[in-house]
């Protein structure tokens, strides 16, 4: 279980987060939603171990987070892939750093590429792939080291609407099949409502958790209900509009 308690943080000398607490249990997909500048990415970087909080505690399975670790796989908004490596060797990169044998990391990387729908593209270079395919490589690379927690920082924000929905479906399929703890950062309200088993709404910066919502639309997809049927369901539309209203309410506080 991920446990974040009483987290305070600064970014570039300014307050970014104030007293943020959250938990992610095994099999839970938590989405953090908020406007630009609310500290969403700072929160993810703290959990990933890339930054140190001003105050508060972060633990994963009761072990304090003190720096980056293979226990926490990260998928970046800009993919963070190595252009001089082909697809399969990008996926192998973390395994290579961990000291896995060449044969075993190739087997693992090919398995992950198959999981994300990229079988047959292992020897393509990154510049030969579409944006959605590059994000699939990023997800495969993060999963290859078998992390306890998967962290995704606005991974689908630069994709077109059709590809974004495909990637949302892929993420829910991975969540269903692996049972991993997942934390996703987004500013897209429909995406947040569709994916989250728990949705945390952050206030404009410095970010504080102002709403916690339990949702089941992602679970419905994982159980076989089509994405389009879910997103056109009046219940989904009503919840999306409710969250939109809460977001606008937070923005109006600043005016």
Curated annotation (Swiss-Prot):
Membrane topology: Peripheral membrane protein
Broad class of enzyme this protein falls into: translocase
Family the entry assigns: Belongs to the ABC transporter superfamily. Taurine importer (TC 3.A.1.17.1) family.
Self-association and partners: The complex is composed of two ATP-binding proteins (TauB), two transmembrane proteins (TauC) and a solute-binding protein (TauA).
Record field: catalytic activity: taurine(out) + ATP + H2O = taurine(in) + ADP + phosphate + H(+)
Name of protein: Taurine import ATP-binding protein TauB
Coiled coil: none
Residues in ABC transporter domain copies: 2-229
Ranges annotated as spanning the membrane: none
EC number: 7.6.2.7
KW Transport (keyword) present: yes
The protein's role, per its UniProt record: Part of the ABC transporter complex TauABC involved in taurine import. Responsible for energy coupling to the transport system.
SUPFAM superfamilies membership: P-loop containing nucleoside triphosphate hydrolases
Residues the record lists as binding ATP: 34-41
One GO CC term on file: plasma membrane
Record's keyword terms, sorted: ATP-binding, Cell inner membrane, Cell membrane, Membrane, Nucleotide-binding, Translocase, Transport
Cysteine disulfide partners in this protein: none
Xref: Pfam families: ABC_tran (PF00005)
Gene name per UniProt: tauB
GO function terms (MF aspect): ABC-type taurine transporter transporter activity; ATP binding; ATP hydrolysis activity
């Amino acid at each position: 279980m991920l446990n974040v308690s009483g987290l305070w943080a600064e970014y570039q000398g300014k307050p970014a987060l104030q007293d943020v607490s959250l938990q992610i249990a095994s099999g839970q997909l938590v989405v953090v939603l908020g406007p630009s500048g609310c500290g969403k990415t700072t929160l993810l970087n703290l959990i990933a171990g890339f930054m140190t909080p001003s105050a508060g505690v972060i633990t994963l399975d009761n072990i304090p987070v003190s720096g980056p670790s293979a226990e926490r796989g990260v998928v970046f908004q800009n993919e963070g892939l190595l252009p001089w490596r082909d697809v399969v060797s990008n996926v192998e990169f973390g395994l290579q750093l961990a000291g896995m044998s060449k044969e075993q990391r190739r087997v693992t990387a090919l398995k992950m590429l198959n999981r994300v729908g990229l079988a047959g593209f292992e020897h393509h270079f990154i510049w030969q792939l579409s944006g959605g395919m590059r994000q699939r490589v990023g997800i495969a690379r993060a999963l290859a080291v078998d992390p306890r927690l998967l962290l995704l920082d606005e991974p689908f924000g630069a994709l077109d609407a059709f590809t974004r929905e495909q990637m949302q479906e892929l993420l829910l399929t991975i969540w269903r099949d692996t049972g991993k703890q997942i934390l996703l950062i987004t500013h897209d309200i429909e995406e947040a409502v569709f994916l989250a088993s728990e949705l945390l709404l952050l206030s404009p910066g410095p970010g504080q958790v102002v709403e916690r919502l339990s949702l089941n639309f992602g679970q419905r997809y994982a159980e076989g209900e089509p994405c389009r049927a879910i997103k056109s369901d009046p219940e989904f539309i009503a919840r999306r509009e409710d969250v939109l209203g809460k977001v606008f309410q937070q923005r109006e506080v600043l005016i």
